[in-house]
Amino acid sequence: MQRELPRTILSLSRACQEGVDDLDYEIIVVDNGSDPCPMLPPTDPPVRFKVVNVKHPSPVGAMNEALAMAEGQVIGAWIDGARMASANLLAAVRDAAAHHPAPVIAIPNRQLGSARQASAARDGYDQAVEDALLDQAGWPAPGTDLFAVSWPEETSVTGAMLESNALFLTRATWDALGGYDPAFSEPGGGMCNPDMLSRAVAHPDTQLIRMDGVATFHQIHGGTSTSDEDLAVSRVKEATRAYTALRGHPPRKVRDRGWVFDAATGVMDKG
């Protein structure tokens, strides 16, 4: 994450986020035992950084530590430090959250490049290619269109969704759900993230809000399930077996249409 995390942090800072001059927000990073520890860029707001006391293969403990540290009333969980934010993400979340007292705001997932990275890597897509792609796109200059140089993981804004790598809930909802389930103890957390989205959507009185025109963008790296096809298949199979043993059924994609917030117009479609 020495290469990827600084970009992710920068993408969330005021230097890259648009329409957040009046937004009071914080960026928290809880490191799960990286060696070496990542070097973070100076940003506004400054990063609140912590290293977990006991390193664990699963990020669940680190995620829950970060949730406990958070001081805001709407908290976004970013389980993958390699995912950059679209420039409108925080402003759009702020505006969407105002429409419901208990929103479940699920940001769509995209991957940099023209295809799924686990497949593209076999055709030569690597960090150097991605660096050149971002340079050509002009990032981090204002107005950079990362959508034009990325591939969508979901078929449509209202399509079936297994997980969101930037999930925003209120403090009350996070507390009621108990954060991420520590039972997901395998490397990478297995299906802890799909489980979190599923439980949040099913929780009483919450409202799923899908986001149109907003996304996170995955950078290729040596992670557990995104950048190597054979490893991805193996990890998903292992995680599916573990999830099924824990929950009594395989992971299920969220098919509820929910509400749809258009980030470009600020209009909420309640269906």
Which residues does each PLM region occupy?
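Acidic donor-binding segment of Leloir-type glycosyltransferases
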Residues: 12-53
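Glycine-rich, basic loop-to-helix element that forms the pyrophosphate-binding segment
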Residues: 54-70
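Active-site acidic short loop of glycosyltransferases
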Residues: 70-73, 179
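Conserved donor NDP-sugar-binding/catalytic core segment of glycosyltransferases
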Residues: 88-135
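A short, conserved alpha-helix in the catalytic core of glycosyltransferases
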Residues: 161-169, 173-178, 185-206
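Short beta-strand-to-loop acidic/aromatic patch adjacent to the donor-nucleotide binding site
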Residues: 73-83
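C-terminal, non-catalytic tails of nucleotide-sugar-dependent glycosyltransferases
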Residues: 114-117, 123, 127-157, 205-211, ...
